[in-house]
Amino acid sequence: AGMEHFRSLEGPCVFIGNHMSTLETFVLPSMIQPWKDVTFVVKESLLKYPFFGPVLGSREPIVVGRSNPREDLVAVLEGGEARLKQGRSVIVFPQSTRSSVFDPAHFNTIGVKLAKRAGVPVIPVALKTDAWGNGNLLKDFGPVDVKKTIHFEFGAPMRIEGTGKAEHQQITEFII
């Protein structure tokens, strides 16, 4: 629901959403790409999987190692701003890791900071994709529970004003 919010939006934006499963990594780009060129912030280890890694790498993602938060911040802000200036939108999952329960305390402001720095709007994204669980051998590829419903909802675009705290709170409330 809410795809009209980015379909009619001129220029690139930052999509900010919660992160429940690997499903978002597959589905979000295919939902957005017909209207906006898009990439995302991904953990480096995802690029090492056979088949999945090269497909993901073809989107020219912003890669973070998740071992040095300062380096990751620089990578997201600089890499994200460069892609946004090229006209490519960026998907950010500020929780940094998947969780079947949304916890606002673990939802950081990196996406808001990126949008403010680049001067582009944010599109909040509320996701319910816990139908795809974590795997035993490979955490990123687990079983799919076909009885569970998935849900993707896009909010209205918002510009980041001032510190961005109010917008971060609005995004958090949209997801909840």
Could you say what each language-model-derived stretch is?
Residues 31, 55, 82, 113-114:
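Hydrophobic/aromatic ligand-binding patch that stacks against planar heteroaromatic rings
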Residues 45, 69-73, 104, 168:
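A conditional alpha-helix N-cap/helix-loop micro-motif detector
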Residues 12-14, 87-93:
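Residue-level preference for the first positions of well-ordered beta-strands
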